[in-house]
Regions:
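Internal catalytic-core helix/loop-beta-alpha segment
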Residues: 77-133
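Short, solvent-exposed loop/turn segments at secondary-structure junctions
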Residues: 37-40, 87-89, 125-128, 169-172
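C-terminal capping/extension of enzyme domains
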Residues: 1-16, 91-108, 137-200
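Short glycine-/acidic-enriched loop or helix-start segments at secondary-structure transitions
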Residues: 42-45, 131-133, 176
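Short, surface-exposed acidic-centric catalytic microdomains
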Residues: 48-98
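Short hydrophobic segments within beta-strands
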Residues: 32-35, 83, 122-123, 167
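Active-site and ligand/interface coordination hotspots across diverse enzymes
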Residues: 1-60, 158-160, 192-200
Length: 200
């Protein structure tokens, strides 16, 4: 299945959105990592060029977690799909609530494409907000408590039978400088990978 084509069929007007143009067997995906927002240049996204800006921070995190990867395909082959909550590049420093809301229908449909997901990682506050907006529509409450990620790290959060792991943003060169967040995000990736391996 091509994710972009599938979402275009399901959602209709996707003209101004950046959707993942990647072929996947949805049944093989056991974990989804939701990053915050698509980059301004499509080539810098996870499924852009092999040495894209987003992969330049993602690969070191996986390796720190003890998962040897070199390309996004290596991550997909391990049953892990990466996407962005907001499908349009940000126009200012912060991601606006409106841009999160505009992308929600597409993110919701995208998540529903994968029937065997056991873990969803929320990489940063925008991903957490977007996921809570989705859960509020279906369950009338937030899936993830609105407290700092640091305080949630050792809390087991389950939503519709799926383990939810709030973590830190995985893109942008700052993450390589902020050693503590890099370490914690890598530990969270390690936890996610253990959970999907244990369920095999």
């Amino acid at each position: 299945m091509n994710i972009k084509s599938e979402l275009q069929q399901l959602c209709g007007d996707t003209q101004n959105l950046r959707l993942n143009d990647v072929n996947i067997e949805p049944e093989t995906i056991q974990a989804i990592m939701i990053n915050e927002v698509v980059p301004s240049c499509p080539e810098d996204d996870f499924y852009g060029k092999p040495d894209s800006a987003y992969m330049s921070t993602t690969i070191p995190m996986f390796r720190k977690a003890g998962i040897e990867v070199g390309l996004v395909q290596d991550i997909l082959n391990r049953g892990i799909y990466i996407t962005n909550a907001v499908k349009t590049p940000k126009s200012e420093y912060a991601v606006s609530k409106e841009s999160i809301e505009n992308s929600l229908p597409y993110l919701g449909k995208e998540l529903a494409l994968f029937p065997n997901v056991k873990v969803i990682m929320l990489m940063g506050d925008v991903a957490k907000k977007a996921f809570n907006m989705i859960s509020k529509k279906t369950t009338k409450k937030n899936a993830v408590p609105s407290i700092s990620t640091y305080k949630l790290r050792n809390t087991e959060i389950i939503y519709k039978g799926i383990r939810i792991i709030p973590s830190y943003i995985m893109t942008g060169q700052n993450i390589l400088i902020e050693k503590s967040k890099f370490e914690m995000a890598s530990e969270d990736i390690e936890t996610m990978y253990r959970l999907i391996k244990d369920s095999d």
